[in-house]
Amino acid sequence: CEHGCVYCFARPSHAYLDLSPGLDFETKLYAKTNAAERLRIELAKPSYRCSPIALGINTDAYQPIGRRYRVTRSLLEVLAECRHPVSLITKNALVLRDLDLLVPMAERGLATVYFSVTTLDNQLAAKMEPRASAPHARLKAIRALSEAGVPVGTMVAPVIPMVTDRDLEAILEAAYDAGARAAGYVLLRLPHELKE
C-alpha cells in the first residue's frame, strides 16, 4: 500500500510475492487492472448471493496510485450498475473524486464510507502514515461526503497504546462534528515481521 503506514498489519502479505514487508510493501505496487471485469463475472454467477462488499479492508481503496489506475472507481461503476451494496474504508481524500457515483448509490442505501483516523496530530500522522491524507483533510472529506448525503463513519484505527489512545475522544468528536455518524476502533496488532 502506497500510504506506507508504519504500523500496517497487511505488510507481511507481500511475502507471498517473495517481497519484503518493509519498503517493498509501499514501493512495489500491484494494480489489479482487471478487478472490475472479474467482479462483474462473480456477480453474474447464479450461485452468487448479494452481500455488502467492503473495499479497503487490507490495503487502502484510495491510494495515490489510484489517480492513475482508477481501480476503485471501476469497481464502484460495476457495483452501481448492479445496485450492489458497498462500504469503503480509506485514509485518503481521493474518495471525493467518486462522489458522482457514491451519492446516487447512497440515495439507494447502497454506499457508506469510513475514514480511518489514527491521530489528529499532523506531525505524528506524517511520520506514521507518510502518504495518506493529513487528518484535517480526512475530516474535510468526511464533511463533504456527509453534506452530499453519503453516510460516513470513522474508524480509529489503529489505537496505539501510549501514542494515540489519548486522542480517542478528540477524534470521535471531530469526526462527529464533520458529519460521521458511526464509529469503531481497532487496536494495534503487529505481525511478527513488524515487531522488530
Predicted segments, located by residue:
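Active-site mouth loops of central-metabolism enzymes
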Residues: 64-66, 128-129, 161-164
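Short, well-ordered secondary-structure micro-motifs
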Residues: 99, 126-127, 165-166, 195
